[in-house]
Amino acid sequence: MVHAKHPLPIKIDYFSSLNFRMNATLYIRQALNIPEKSINATLQLLAEDCTIPFISRYRKDKTGNLDEIQIEQIEKLNTQFEDLVKRKNTILKSVEEQSALTPELQQRIEESFDLQELEDLYLPFKKRRKTKADAAKEKGLEPLAKIIMSQKVQDLQFLASKYVNNEVSSEEEALQGARDIMAEWINENMYVRKNLRRMFRQKAVITSKAVKAKKDEEEAQKFSQYFEWEEALSRIPSHRLLAMLRAEAEGFVKIQTGIDKEEAIAFIEHTVIKSDNETSEQITLAIKDSYKRLLEPAISNETLQEAKEKADKKAIEIFSGNLSQLLLAPPLGEKRILAIDPGYKSGCKVVCLDEKGDLLHNETLYPHAPQHESGMAMKKIRSMVNAYHIEAISIGNGTASRETEFFIKKIAFDRPLQVFVVSEAGASVYSASKIARDEFPNYDVTVRGAVSIGRRLADPLAELVKIDAKSIGVGQYQHDVDQSQLKIELDTTVMKCVNSVGINLNTASKSLLSYVSGIGEKTAENIVNYRAENGAFADRKELKKVPRLGEKAFQQAAAFVRITHSTNPLDNSAVHPEAYGIVEQMAKDLGIKTHELIANKEKIALIDPEKYITKDIGILGIRDIIKELEKPGLDPRKAAKVFEFDPSVKKMTDLKTGMVLPGIVNNITAFGCFVDLGIKESGLVHISQLKEGFVSDVNEVVKLHQHVQVKVTEVDEARKRIQLSMIL
């Protein structure tokens, strides 16, 4: 028995109650196929406030070459373990305060490392509102319930009559009270709950039905497929479940989850009823009541919540993957750019930027309807290109984008210029943000938005970190998932991307600096202020002069920042300052200076890595140093490429079934990808149309911003939907 109050037969699951003491390492090892030594080393480094980018890049020899994903998993599982221990201690304290902690119950709580099992153990002791069972116990009916549950042959009417008094008016009321108590016992039975959960996980069906009063509303039509829907919950795709839950949240459908009621009740009867006599009928009634009133609602909600959490996780994974690809999009680099935020009546906002992205000039031109001042606009753009030595043109992909692109390509410039169409998703959010106001206090939102479009071409990572990732528009049901978990994952993704590329310490914005390993918002602000007061950093060591940037922060951050004209050439590489002495020794052994070793493949080939192993830096670290010396400060991002849409397609009505068109992947979901064809509406390539054969993961076939060829298979102008195929 779980505790003395329960006369129910309890079946113990010995596998989950093995008598051993769990620790964090064992808990993590059960979930991950990672050696104990690697887990312990990682936990120690995390406890020392080392960041994941730092550990994965500069502590490979300690962790056994774990990557960022594995280190992140260890960190999450360790937090999960700590939360379980805290919850366990809270439960033990609460039960003890109620003087109900038996040695058996204490042992089961201490040995359990399953949250649901812990909550089931705690269920009888939880503080709650008064229940039917509580009311029956107050009337003195618990002994009657125990006698019935003992399932020995009794004259129940005679037995129940003994409990008739001022508070219990009849034998039936006494039996009803006993059934209420038994129903609660059945609800609290761990074996019953555990196996019902298993049945729900395996067999639950989710159904949705339209809310009649709202089904004819225009907004409801996008959810029309869920007006009458039924599907196995275990097999429902994440995007469909989130869509159904959104439809319910907006009041258009009602959702239910459940299993076959008769099967569930039969299982409970088989578990609880051990005799065939007069008591069986009362216990069966209690079982049916317990299932309908207590078990089914609770476990149904639990199961749906589990499914929602899995769907959230999948959606967040997709969002994070899309964000990573967007942040690591090819940069054009330090070029002088003319950027245009296109428009019709309000005009095209034009800005000229220098190599650092600083604003040189801005004005508004009106080449399109209703003004049609294309001649004047051409003349002014030619003048700006010459005056500011423009090297490339960046056009936002929103309203009037195609018309502006065609207009620009008609201009006869004195020299060849690359013309790029850039996603402007989130540019309006940036332009109205505090960051934008601080950068451009004397300019309005239209100028700030155009500047962002230009800077995105030069360096997407540096510009996009200024925008709330949720505003970039590459997520799947991003507003429906757990928002705190989404923020954690997106922040982690941004941090990974920033540190995989590295940043220029003398030009990086506060936003970009705040994502560098070991540097938060406050320290980033201090760095920017120090730079403003003292000028450019001469070397990495100067970072230590920044207020509140101590030795630990320096250790975590130094190798991720670059100084292009430092007196030490290693400051412009990913070699950590702690390894400078090793590189200097390598150069000395080869009879050359350090700067002569960098990028010198012939000399680097002569280095014996084994010779330079130290107690702090092993063979993996030495090999990374040698690799970095070959190509110091290598940017992992590819080079930007010019892309051209089909000039014959300017609007949806220009599309015809069977057309093969160039496009750019602009969003990836679990069910396929969306492709920009150069018009307002993006087309969908369903996962089944990505390539011949089965595709389990869209990311195996396409990446965000990938240039693709697609065939138009269906155009639905009324619903503004375009179906595409990559099977040509």
Label each PLM-derived region with a short phrase:
Residues 70-73, 80, 84-339, 345-431, ...:
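Duplex nucleic acid-engaging cores and interfaces of nucleic-acid transaction enzymes
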Residues 302-320, 471-504, 612-657:
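Long, charged amphipathic helices and adjacent flexible linkers at domain junctions
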